[in-house]
Amino acid sequence: MHQLVLNKATKFAVAVLLTVFGNIYAADDIGGVYEQSGTPGSITRTTGEELTAQIDTGIQSYDNVETENGRLKIKFVDETQISLTEHTLVEITEYVFDPDPSKSKMAMNFVAGTARFATGGLGLVPKENIVIETPTATIGIRGTDFTTTVDELGRSLVILLPDANCDDKVKLEEGCRPSGSITVTNAGGVVTLEEAFQAVMVSTFETAPTNPVVLVDLDLNQIDNMFIISKPEEIIQAEEEQQEALKGDGGLLDFTDLD
């Protein structure tokens, strides 16, 4: 259910945070666009109002944010950030911000395209109160930085990224630490990602995620909508192994194998 809680104390706290971030938005805004390149996308409100997604455009709860031939980054009042590549659609389905962090919540639906999610460093929204959904899975946050690519069929590729101390291109032998951990869950099972560049593919909501694999020599600039079409070899192998397991079990996969 959509929900937004902004009492007087909360609105004051939001205004203070937005001032600190260097951008002043409307009282109901929960963040705003702070980077944009290429063709501007759009922000659609529940009222039907459509805004151009350009720098300093405010973001409100329940907004649908969609890019065209361009990219943008959004920063929320708790410093959570999402980065959208071309032709990406994200729905902000819930944002409850309260001066008491335990009462704050965030939920988003990554509908299509490629989005990178990084939780805020202020701890204003507890990670356990953040939920990201795709058409085929629910992502529980116990980490801070990951990407999701969703194709036109809803298939989702989820990658846990390293911590902020790693460069854009990092070789695993350099000892890159993960940004935390995330769970990927659907009707077929649950998988936990807890290594830098660890990834899973989720084909349908009823089919369990593939076994986690580590993507070697990954350049973060490669992660866009083509990444799910031209899949990494590690993901292709994981999908083939899953198909073989399904055949061997007569279509029933033993989820204990995913631990």
Regions inferred by a protein language model and the residue ranges of each:
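Short, solvent-exposed loop/turn positions at domain surfaces
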Residues: 53, 59-61, 78, 126, ...
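Short N-terminal segments immediately surrounding and downstream of signal-peptide cleavage
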Residues: 27-45
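Flexible, membrane-facing loop/turn or short amphipathic-helix motifs
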Residues: 43-48, 76, 120-123
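Glycine-centered tight beta-turn/hairpin loop motif at sheet-sheet or coil-to-beta transitions
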Residues: 46-48, 77-79, 136, 188
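N-terminal post-signal-peptidase region of extra-cytosolic proteins
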Residues: 46-62, 66-71
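C-terminal interaction modules
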Residues: 1-29, 50-54, 68, 85, ...
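Short, small-residue-rich packing micro-motifs
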Residues: 65-74, 83-137, 180
